[in-house]
Curated annotation (Swiss-Prot):
Polar residues biased stretches: 751-762
Disulphide connectivity of cysteines: none
Protein name, as recorded: Uncharacterized protein HI_0568
Organism: Haemophilus influenzae (strain ATCC 51907 / DSM 11121 / KW20 / Rd)
Annotated region described as Disordered, given as residue ranges: 724-762
């Protein structure tokens, strides 16, 4: 029953049929993974893709947590003997955790409040009398409730107690809270002020020293910037419920909302002034504080979710970047005083040689000889150069060496070295290269990530890759869960070579665990290469369920069965046998003859187990066995002579690589150790709502330099090449980027019109 209700809710959100969601719930509950369901159970789910299934999974967790909480609350209220049919219906009807907690608020066990103490002192009848019959005079009526033994010393104490009883009652009314919350969510303004004396210390938050903005309009990067400022003791944040009220106005519109909700009319009766005070205090002392805390938390939660989504999309683009392929590669980890670390790997990524050279400290000739020798010795095809400190100098040095090579010149490529140091110090790197200096391991990672970014980057904790917006400010548990899902989806979308994959890569395959992945590697080391997928069943602790989940994503090149190199799941091999019988072809002939496959009618091969989606997927695999969804390998060519920010001039048109996409634009590496910012307004001639619709991390783009601020190391770029450049000493309505190479975090700014820095982050 519960699964059916959940299916209805999620189906409406995804605009699909409830039976699709119901099937997905059953599959997930049976231990199937999202990649497996998306790829091999399309008939059951009606073709839900991995993006839809990830949303479904998140909502399923939320709604099941909601249901568990609902049952706990119902039990608690029932045990108190206060569960009415009306309340039960309201609790069953809500699909919001916030609303559920509002309904529970009056019944939630709590420490004795002032209101409860007043009730125990016998003041509830006074509160009800004055509220419901305002013709009574408060002072004279309260006299009969004075009781020194109960702590009610005089009529003032009695009236104060009665007021508190009503305040607590109204502040726990779910309907009243919903009305005021709705108004504040639409109309309240967040106010940010600098704490006196913190101006110098908090200079980086200067755009928020006196900032106001409609709560509903605050974008995630500005919200997180303000919260960071508050956490660092620089800013004070508050909500202004009445931004349009005249200065000096003492009454909030929220008091009017409360009055209307309670259906109170003031007609000049004796208790009206007292009742008006009850409403004012209910708002100022109870409701406003409660809802400000809640709405601030909601703003932060929403901002964190958006930031996590940005990180996930950037990570996807980075992991799915086109591999350079199986080529002999030299990795250079640039450095000045400490030297350039050099690692040589073969076309499979196996480490062959390492050294350290010092081309930037007066030993260039010696370094040239060393690099030239390694290139000749190992027939180097690619040189991967990390993009950190001394990157351009190292690139220029490498190109000078290449000029002396007559033929088969290697290609130099600058790659992101984000996370390389994390890999170098990791347990996995230590186990892989126990006798190799930590600094040299980074060069190995740089070389390998050019050959195959996905295979190498899975060895690094996703958060360390550094393509996120405020990743250190968000909920780390949610961030880890989201990024793990991204890595899992990317790995399974590409597939894994069973005979060469590392344990970290294997661990990301559907159905795998770290233990099973290590068992596969150990089995491979002891028994040699896998010749078939079925051999996986011999791996210790890899049972039928794990095999079912992982087999289709494992690839075996040149194995016993050509299908093992494809994305066809072993369970569907009988379908291929039918196709072979129908075409009178061998599997080798069929897999190299796309024309024959295209002439087949998929409906001919449908049976009770395998429907049209599966057969169509099989056809695609037969046409292009083990096809790689990643794009063609391309690299940016940095301009000669443009190596430092001081080399930039307004109007220059340069080529660069997108390193990070945020909600306010995209950062681009143009080879000067400082990323430039293309503001969202400069991404396209058309209106852009979401920068991710135009660019993604890793894209090669042409940009024009709009503005350069050398002292503050800020660069403003545009992808609208006809856009006018700005003189360096003038103000503009956009920011200048201050994103140094290797730095993974930006400070958000606001959109105050007189601030060059602030407006880009609007």
């Amino acid at each position: 029953m519960l699964n059916q209700q959940i299916s209805q809710i999620i189906a409406a959100e995804l605009t699909v049929q409830p039976q699709q969601i119901f099937a997905a719930i059953q599959l997930l509950d049976d231990g199937n993974t999202i990649p497996f369901i998306a790829r091999y159970r399309k008939e059951a789910t009606g073709g839900l893709d991995d993006t839809q299934l990830r949303h479904f999974e998140t909502r399923l967790i939320y709604l099941r947590e909601l249901e568990d909480r609902r049952q706990t609350i119902l039990k608690s209220i029932e045990e108190q003997g206060k569960l009415t049919d009306e309340l039960r219906d309201k609790i069953h009807a809500t699909q919001s955790k916030t609303e559920l907690e509002d309904l529970y608020l009056p019944y939630k066990p709590k420490r004795r409040t002032k209101g409860q103490i007043a009730i125990e002192a016998g003041l509830e009848p006074l509160a009800n009398l004055l509220w419901n019959e305002p013709k009574n005079d408060p002072e004279s009526t309260a006299l009969s409730f004075v009781d020194a033994e109960k702590g009610v010393a005089d009529s003032k104490a009695a009236l104060d107690g009665a007021r508190i009883i009503l305040m607590e009652r109204f502040a726990e009314d779910a309907g009243l809270l919903a009305k005021v919350r709705d108004y504040l969510a639409k109309n309240a303004v967040i106010v940010s002020k600098v704490i006196e004396g913190k101006e110098t210390e908090g200079a980086k938050f200067q755009d928020y020293f006196d900032h106001q903005e409609l709560l509903k309009n605050v974008p995630s990067h500005r919200a997180l910037a303000m919260f960071r400022g508050r956490n660092e003791g620089i800013l004070q944040l508050s909500l202004n419920a009445d931004p349009d009220a005249e200065e000096g106005s003492r009454q909030s519109y929220c008091e009017e909302i409360i009055r209307d909700y309670l259906d109170v009319r003031f007609t000049g009766q004796p208790a009206d002034k007292w009742r008006e005070q009850v409403i004012a205090w209910t708002w100022k002392i109870k409701v406003s504080l409660h809802l400000e805390t809640e709405l601030m938390a909601s703003l932060r939660e929403k901002a964190e979710e958006e930031a996590i989504d940005v990180f996930a999309r950037n990570l996807t683009a980075l992991l799915m970047a086109a591999p350079a392929g199986a080529k002999s590669t030299m990795g250079l980890d640039p450095g000045l005083r400490t030297g350039v670390k050099v690692a040589m790997v073969d076309n499979t990524g196996k480490l062959l040689d390492t050294t350290t050279i010092y081309p930037h400290t007066g030993r260039e000739a010696e370094a040239q000889v060393a690099i030239f020798s390694l290139i000749r010795k190992h027939n180097v095809e690619l040189i991967a150069i990390g993009n950190g400190t001394a990157s351009r100098e190292t690139e220029r040095f490498a190109k000078d060496v290449i000029k002396e090579i007559k033929e088969n010149k290697p290609q130099t490529v600058v790659v992101s070295e984000a996370g390389a140091s994390v890999y170098s110090a990791s347990e996995f790197a230590a186990n892989e290269f126990p006798n190799l200096d930590v600094s040299l391991r980074g060069a190995v990672s740089i070389a390998r990530r050019l050959q195959d970014p996905l295979a190498e980057l899975v060895k690094i904790e996703p958060k360390a890759i550094g393509v996120g917006q405020y990743q250190h400010d968000v909920n780390q548990t949610q961030l880890a869960r989201k990024l793990d899902a991204v890595v899992e989806d990317c790995v399974n979308a590409v597939g894994v070579d069973l005979n060469t994959a590392s344990a970290p890569l294997l661990a990301r395959v559907a159905g795998m665990t770290k233990t099973l992945a290590q068992n596969i590697v150990e089995y491979r080391d002891e028994n040699g290469r896998f010749e078939s997928r079925s051999e996986l069943k011999k791996v210790p602790r890899l049972g039928p369920k794990a095999f079912e989940q992982c087999a289709g994503f494992m690839r075996i090149a040149n194995g016993k069965n050509p299908l093992d190199a494809s994305g066809v799941h072993p369970e569907a091999y009988p379908v291929v046998e039918k196709i072979l019988q129908a075409t009178a072809q061998s599997i080798q002939d069929l897999m190299s003859n796309a024309g024959v496959v295209r002439q087949l009618d998929a409906k001919q091969f449908i049976d009770e187990q395998f429907g049209l989606p599966t057969v169509q997927d099989i056809f695609k695999e037969l046409e292009k066995p083990g096809r790689d969804p990643r794009g063609e390998f391309k690299t940016a060519v940095f301009a000669e002579g443009v190596e430092e920010i001081t080399d930039l001039k307004s109007g220059m048109i340069l080529e660069g690589t997108v390193t990070n996409v945020t909600n306010f634009g995209a950062f681009v590496d143009i080879g000067v150790h400082q990323d430039g910012l293309v503001h969202i307004s400069s991404l396209s001639d058309k209106f852009v709502e979401d920068p991710h619709q135009v660019v993604k991390t890793g894209n090669i783009v042409k940009v024009k330099v709009l503005e350069v601020d050398v002292p503050r190391k800020r660069i403003a770029l545009t992808m609208r090449l006809d856009e006018s450049a700005v003189k360096n000493d003038s103000k503009s309505d956009r920011t200048l980027s201050t994103r140094p190479r290797g730095n993974m975090q930006r400070e958000a700014r606001n959109s105050r019109g007189n601030n060059v820095i602030g407006n880009a982050f609007a």
